[in-house]
A protein has these predicted regions:
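Phosphate-binding loop of NTP-binding sites
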Residues: 2-142, 157-162, 167
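Adenine nucleotide phosphate-binding catalytic loops in nucleotide-utilizing enzymes
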Residues: 101-102, 140-198
Length: 198
């Protein structure tokens, strides 16, 4: 419903959708903070923050909505076209409701459908990569991996004490750029491995 109403608002926001078994709320909060810090008016919504219908109907509007989606919400999701989508990880959860792991995985995989720009997956969780490979995305959307190890091409990861980007630069085959140091991450309280991955 929210997706269908979005074009009737004063400001058409990009949707950044996030799911996974663990880490969704933290990731949505971090992404919302980064977008706002970068001058993009963003709001966390879905399972956290403002209800998504309220965010869409906000009279001032937003440039971006960072939407946390559960497997239950994704199960019933109609067609949307997120700007970017992410599956952080996948573990046995809610299997009684979904009827098994494959059904749970299929519900989570719906987050990638029709993604416009970037499908973010966890390099250390091969099931998330296979979900991206199987997704029907918009032509030009890229698969972007994240890892706590050394990043490969089209990935973000760590080399020694530096968070490196090999995904969003022209010569990603041969180069990387520094995003932050571990000291920077420590200063904002995200130095534990699961928070570093988020």
């Amino acid at each position: 419903l929210a997706w269908r109403l979005r074009d009737k608002t004063s400001r058409l926001a990009h949707w950044f959708t996030v799911t996974g078994t663990n880490g969704k709320t933290t990731t949505v909060q971090l992404l919302t903070a980064m977008l706002n810090q970068g001058g993009i008016k963003a709001e966390a919504c879905g399972n956290i923050g403002k209800p998504i219908l309220d965010a869409i109907r906000d009279p001032e509007g937003f440039d971006a909505l960072v939407v946390e989606l559960s497997s239950f919400q994704l199960h019933y999701l109609g067609q949307i076209f997120p700007f970017s989508s992410a599956v952080l990880n996948l573990a046995d959860d809610h299997l009684d409701w979904h009827g098994g792991f494959e059904q749970y995985k299929a519900a989570k995989a719906k987050v990638y459908e029709n993604t416009v720009a970037a499908c973010v997956y966890n390099v250390m969780d091969k099931s998330t990569e296979s979900m991206v490979e199987d997704a029907d995305v918009i032509d030009g959307a890229r698969a972007i991996g994240f890892t706590l190890g050394i990043p490969g091409r089209s990935q973000v990861g760590y080399v020694e004490d530096i968070l490196c980007d090999r995904a969003f630069l022209d010569d990603r085959a041969n180069n990387a750029i520094e995003i932050a140091t571990l000291e920077d991450l420590s200063e904002i309280g995200v130095l534990t491995p699961h928070l570093m991955a988020n």
